[in-house]
Amino acid sequence: MTDQVYVTLREDQDKLWNLFHYHKNEMIVTKSGRKMFPKLEYVVRGLTPNKLYAMMLHIEPSDDHRYKFSSGEWVKSGKAEKHREPKKLWHADGVRSGKEWMTNPVCFDRVKITNCAESTNASMIFLHSMHKYTPVMSIYESPSESPFSVPQPSTRLVTSVRLTYTEFIAVTAYQNDAVIKLKIKFNPFAKGFREGSQSDRKRNSPSADDSTTDESSSQVSSPQPKKSRTVSVSPPLMPRILPTMIPPPPAINPLFYSLPYFSHLAATGNFPPVPFQFPFGLPCFSPMSFPTPPPSLKNVKKEEQEDIEQEINVV
């Protein structure tokens, strides 16, 4: 009997995805990878409780077009780049029973999207910037009786789910101000786009006007010369040369001066290296060493590190 599986998003995430979809959602792609927001948290119903399943996610192109943001909206700008076979990622929980999958939402929060085609990170999916994509979750029935087995591509496909309102356009910088406001409002980690950072975003955006000036410069009454965009480079950090640390001479008992050997050393100032091994021939003395503790460089190194950190912070 075929499972009648029903898949949707968790209620709060479902509302967010629909809200973003209304404004044509955008997702940032970077070389180091970026997690998606809103999250993909699927709610699965209809699985056989005692059967074993594995969940897989891939992101496929929504169409064969390239897009650009022009006059406040996304428009088609040509044919899409040649797409490679979508990378498919198994859920980190591996193989679990239908009862376990249906108990909690299936969350793919470890997946990151990147624009680096050479990335070998197992949790990253490569996407072309300025292209539209749709996430797809697939459910496979596992033939193994062990819940600890590794999912295999040959397992039977139960269903694949494509939710049209989860599609998005991959970008290297957000283009739509409405999307930015939604990201700031609902994403607690969108600190890079809080107040005061939108001007920076527009300078990095390929569709923004580079002639825009800062608000502070427009408030100056007298004309000011344009400041050239120069990069402030701090002078190279020179290694600090520590003064030569000479260990103090060992404390010599005055009794030793009566001995010929030590009286000669006291006159010349050439004391034996420490630790000094006393000869067995001297009476009343142990052959154990009497070392003088070396000077501690711990405080010197600590002060040097603090100075370097202060220089780095000032730059």
From Swiss-Prot:
Extent of Basic and acidic residues compositional bias = 193-203
**Which terms in the GO cellular component ontology are assigned?**
chromatin; nucleus; transcription regulator complex
Query: Which regions of the protein are recorded as binding DNA?
Result: 11-195
Q: What happens when the gene is disrupted?
A: RNAi-mediated knockdown causes about 5% embryonic lethality with 1-10% of hatching larvae displaying posterior morphological defects. Defective intercalation of dorsal hypodermis. Simultaneous RNAi-mediated knockdown of tbx-9 causes at least 48% of embryos to fail to hatch and those that do display severe morphological defects and die as larvae. Simultaneous RNAi-mediated knockdown of tbx-9 abolishes muscle expression of vab-7.
| Presence of keyword DNA-binding | yes
Q: Please state where this protein is localized.
A: Nucleus
Name the major location. Answer: nucleus
Q: Where is the composition biased (Acidic residues)?
A: 305-315
| Keyword DNA-binding set for record | yes
Molecular-function annotations in GO = DNA binding; DNA-binding transcription factor activity; DNA-binding transcription factor activity, RNA polymerase II-specific; RNA polymerase II cis-regulatory region sequence-specific DNA binding
Q: Which SUPFAM superfamilies match?
A: p53-like transcription factors
Q: Note the superkingdom of the native organism.
A: Eukaryota
- Keywords associated with the record: Developmental protein, DNA-binding, Nucleus, Transcription, Transcription regulation
Q: Name one GO biological process term.
A: positive regulation of DNA-templated transcription
InterPro entries reported for this sequence: p53-like_TF_DNA-bd_sf, T-box_DNA-bd, T-box_sf, TF_T-box, TF_T-box_CS
Q: Where is the composition biased (Low complexity)?
A: 205-225
What is this protein's function? Transcription factor. Involved in the control of early morphogenesis of the intestine, hypodermis and body-wall muscle. Involved in regulating expression of vab-7. Appears to have partially redundant function to tbx-9.
**PANTHER family reported for this sequence:** T-BOX PROTEIN 33-RELATED, T-BOX PROTEIN-RELATED
* Listed name of the protein: T-box transcription factor tbx-8
